[in-house]
């Protein structure tokens, strides 16, 4: 089941709940003559609708999150972006735009990730959580796409970050330094060694950079053991392609 199928079910469930509510209210209105009982019945039905909508929304959000982040379903990613980038609600259009940054980063299209992130960051009144998210993706995309980047330039970029979430700010700085060490300076960095993540792409990312760290240390056996975990994964993903090159 992809995103479009989930969205169709969501629409069906919400409309069905609304229609059923209207039918029940009409039934109560015509069947119950006692006004207090009729009012109570209508309130119960409305409360039931509110609960149903809450449960439907919870199911929808968890299912979409699983498709995008746990299953890493490319079809769903593209459908999600295409469907929501022209949505009536501004928040959905913004979410689609930031999702495009994420997808570009995961597939190694760092130029697009950088361009899109800068475009969104230039908007007035951008919510803090999106600004934080985009700054994190932007600096990592720069590191991975500019092999000539100097450490001084990296430090300058990190000094310009305005991420307000302390945890994300620390993670972004440490990860950016680790990426620089491993991919540009070709120096060891153990940052990824203790990391875990419930989402699939970060899991694959951790595996690849642990393997790269092992290779730089000269531990070829461990590097190959880690890289075998990437075998069979979608080669549209940047770290999978890079892992294949490293395994040669």
Regions found by a protein language model. Name each.
Residues 76-84, 110-122, 146-164, 186-199, ...:
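Alpha-helical repeat scaffolds
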Residues 68-69, 105, 142-143, 182-186, ...:
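Hydrophobic/aromatic side-chain positions at a characteristic register within alpha-helices
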Residues 1-78:
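N-terminal alpha-helical membrane-insertion module
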Residues 62-63, 92-102, 133-141, 169-181, ...:
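"A position-specific structural signal for the A-helix of alpha-solenoid helical repeats
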Residues 50-125:
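N-terminal topogenic membrane-targeting module
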Residues 166-170, 176, 180-205:
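Extended amphipathic alpha-helical interaction segments
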Residues 87-93, 128-131, 165-170, 201:
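Residue signature of alpha-solenoid helical repeat architecture, marking inter-repeat boundaries
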């Amino acid at each position: 089941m992809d995103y479009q199928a989930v969205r169709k079910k969501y629409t069906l469930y919400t409309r069905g709940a609304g229609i059923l509510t209207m039918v029940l209210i009409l039934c109560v209105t015509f069947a119950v003559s006692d006004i207090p009982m009729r009012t109570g019945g209508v309130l119960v039905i409305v409360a039931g609708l509110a609960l149903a909508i809450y449960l439907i929304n919870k199911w929808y959000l968890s299912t979409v999150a699983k498709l995008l982040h746990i299953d890493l379903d490319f079809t769903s990613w593209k459908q999600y972006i295409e469907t929501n980038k022209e949505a009536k609600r501004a928040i959905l259009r913004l979410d689609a735009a930031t999702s495009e940054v994420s997808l570009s980063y995961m597939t190694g299209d760092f130029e697009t990730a950088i361009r899109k992130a800068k475009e969104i960051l230039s908007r007035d009144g951008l919510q803090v959580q999106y600004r934080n998210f985009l700054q994190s993706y932007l600096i990592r995309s720069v590191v991975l796409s500019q092999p000539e980047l100097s450490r001084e330039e990296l430090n300058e970029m990190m000094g310009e970050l305005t991420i307000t979430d302390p945890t994300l700010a620390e993670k972004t700085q440490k990860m950016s330094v680790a990426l620089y060490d491993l991919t540009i300076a070709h120096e060891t960095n153990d940052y990824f060694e203790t990391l875990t993540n419930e989402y699939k792409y970060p899991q694959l990312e951790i595996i690849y950079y642990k393997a790269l760290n092992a290779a730089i240390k000269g531990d070829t056996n461990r590097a190959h053991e880690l890289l075998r975990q990437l075998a069979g994964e979608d080669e549209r993903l940047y770290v999978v392609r890079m892992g294949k090159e490293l395994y040669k």
